[in-house]
Amino acid sequence: MAFNIHNRNLLSLEHHTNRELRYLLDLTRDLKAK
């Protein structure tokens, strides 16, 4: 499931849910593995 992270500040983690943060971590892991 994708999340809309457009125009969101990733420097401030307080505005993100745990689910969104997990998605971003999984996405970076997958991109790094390519």
Curated annotation (Swiss-Prot):
Top-rank lineage group of the source organism: Bacteria
Keywords: Arginine metabolism, Cytoplasm, Transferase
EC number assigned by the record: 2.1.3.3
A GO biological-process term: arginine catabolic process to ornithine
Self-association state and partner proteins as the record states: Probably nonameric or dodecameric.
Protein name from the UniProt record: Ornithine carbamoyltransferase, catabolic
Pathway: Amino-acid degradation; L-arginine degradation via ADI pathway; carbamoyl phosphate from L-arginine: step 2/2
Catalytic activity: carbamoyl phosphate + L-ornithine = L-citrulline + phosphate + H(+)
GO molecular function: ornithine carbamoyltransferase activity
UniProt entry tagged with the keyword DNA-binding: no
Sequence similarity: Belongs to the aspartate/ornithine carbamoyltransferase superfamily. OTCase family.
Annotated organism of origin: Pseudomonas putida
Annotated compartments: Cytoplasm
Positions of transmembrane segments: none
One GO CC term, this protein: cytoplasm
